[in-house]
Amino acid sequence: MDKVNSCCCGVNAKPCCTDPNSGCCCVSKTDNCCKSDTKECCTGTGEGCKCVNCKCCKPQANCCCGVNAKPCCFDPNSGCCCVSKTNNCCKSDTKECCTGTGEGCKCTSCQCCKPVQQGCCCGDKAKACCTDPNSGCCCSNKANKCCDATSKQECQTCQCCK
């Protein structure tokens, strides 16, 4: 089934939320999604249209945070993307940050939605840098220490070094 690109999940959703199992997409977090037998998308409330196994209708607040956090991971259900190891999120349209996961989230400072800083390397044999969007630091490899892109100072909190 061709993927549908005209419906979205959640109030803050921008990119469409497609169910990878069926090719259907949800119109919202609460509305019905697709028939369990034929996998056809439905907009009514008929039999088999309960959205029970449609993954895109389930909240996904912890999209890209934690130890292996890289550049932001967008959550189509909440309209947020992770910014740090503490699950801070930012809205995809305004780039405002929120400490919650969706509607009514409180805005704080957002790092991962800002352009990543490039151009610094540390160590004797520094090659291409590993940029950490959470701290703004980058390092030459996972063994060397990190440096700030502007001051070239060591950055002990650069997660990409760990």
From Swiss-Prot:
Induction: By cadmium, and to a lesser extent by mercury, copper, heat, hydrogen peroxide and IL-6. The metallothioneins are involved in the cellular sequestration of toxic metal ions. Keywords: Cadmium, Metal-binding, Metal-thiolate cluster. Belongs to the metallothionein superfamily. Type 7 family. The gene is MTT1. One of its GO terms (molecular function) is cadmium ion binding. This is Cadmium metallothionein. It comes from Tetrahymena thermophila. Disulfide bonds: none annotated. InterPro entries: Metalthion_7.
